[in-house]
Amino acid sequence: MEYRVTDIITLLNAEYKGEVVEKVSKLSPFFHSDEKSLTFAADEKFLKNLSQTKAKVIIVPDIDLPLIEGKGYIVVKDSPRVIMPKLLHFFSRNLKKIEKMREDSAKIGENVDIAPNVYIGHDVVIGNNVKIFPNVTIGEGSIIGDGTVIYSNVSIREFVEIGKNCVIQPGAVIGSDGFGFVKVNGNNTKIDQIGTVIVEDEVEIGANTTIDRGAIGDTIIKKYTKIDNLVQIAHNDIIGENCLIISQVGIAGSTTIGNNVTLAGQVGVAGHLEIGDNTMIGAQSGVPGNVEANKILSGHPLVDHREDMKIRVAMKKLPELLKRVKALEEKK
């Protein structure tokens, strides 16, 4: 689908500068765009790297910016973040009306076992040897790879992609809206989440785990990663290959986790950061910033695991040490 740039300019009450581009096909993240994309630069991180995006049309604030050959600017008077609800709604896809439990346009492979009370939406593609248990919902345009097993009460929303030989345990929700809101006139205003979730081959997703769809771009779970029960993965996260994510981990949005990473139970990971390959984070730790590869860390704040163990041992001695300090002060 293509969108006229002039319609977007009118929608945003904006001006245009630079190379004339008539149409774009999608809204994409700044560093993950192509020549058919529209993207936006909301802050200094992006504004100083305008030449680094492949998008030919960029939404920018009304400030003095150098023109770049081959690129056009849609200049908005409001902050680019303020116009986000309007912009993402413009690019959101309208879903078809639900008509029956298995829509006629759905394509079902060979040797597929579908239990009663399963909804299969318009244009869904289900591969061979898939097993789907009762009370599952598979939304419009989703793709389920060969050999995947989907247990009861799983919700897979529209346009989600599930790879081959995956296992999705009961109650998991894949493709729910990310927690995306901005303040408009002092009110929390929802931003349409127009991305999706891509789950690669051989992934397991635990019971009652939730994986949010991307706001712009996709949330990605790479092959052979195993996710335990009751895990929250937010919008636009990228989880690498062969990761282990244990129960009650929460990962905030737009975080990238490398390959072979282990996050132990109840780890909290902040948003917009990177965790390097082969890293292990101990249980109940907090991750507030980037983590280098090949580290074993724990605690809050996060430190080397051996140092964290020494701190915990020392903390047990604090009551006795305080008594000794008080006694020494009284002798003065």
Curated annotation (Swiss-Prot):
Keyword field: Acyltransferase, Lipid A biosynthesis, Lipid biosynthesis, Lipid metabolism, Repeat, Transferase
Active site per UniProt: H235
Protein's UniProt keywords contain Transcription regulation: no
Reactions this protein catalyses: a UDP-3-O-[(3R)-3-hydroxyacyl]-alpha-D-glucosamine + a (3R)-hydroxyacyl-[ACP] = a UDP-2-N,3-O-bis[(3R)-3-hydroxyacyl]-alpha-D-glucosamine + holo-[ACP] + H(+)
GO cellular component, one term: membrane
Top-rank taxon, per record: Bacteria
Gene Ontology MF terms: N-acyltransferase activity
Any one GO BP annotation for this protein: lipid A biosynthetic process
The protein's Enzyme Commission number: 2.3.1.191
SUPFAM superfamilies membership: Trimeric LpxA-like enzymes
Gene3D superfamilies per record: Hexapeptide repeat proteins, MurE/MurF, N-terminal domain
Transmembrane segments: none
Pathway assigned in UniProt: Bacterial outer membrane biogenesis; LPS lipid A biosynthesis
PANTHER family: UDP-3-O-ACYLGLUCOSAMINE N-ACYLTRANSFERASE, UDP-3-O-ACYLGLUCOSAMINE N-ACYLTRANSFERASE 1, MITOCHONDRIAL-RELATED
Family, as annotated: Belongs to the transferase hexapeptide repeat family. LpxD subfamily.
Function: Catalyzes the N-acylation of UDP-3-O-acylglucosamine using 3-hydroxyacyl-ACP as the acyl donor. Is involved in the biosynthesis of lipid A, a phosphorylated glycolipid that anchors the lipopolysaccharide to the outer membrane of the cell.
Assembly notes: Homotrimer.
Protein name as catalogued: UDP-3-O-acylglucosamine N-acyltransferase
Species of origin: Fusobacterium nucleatum subsp. nucleatum (strain ATCC 25586 / DSM 15643 / BCRC 10681 / CIP 101130 / JCM 8532 / KCTC 2640 / LMG 13131 / VPI 4355)
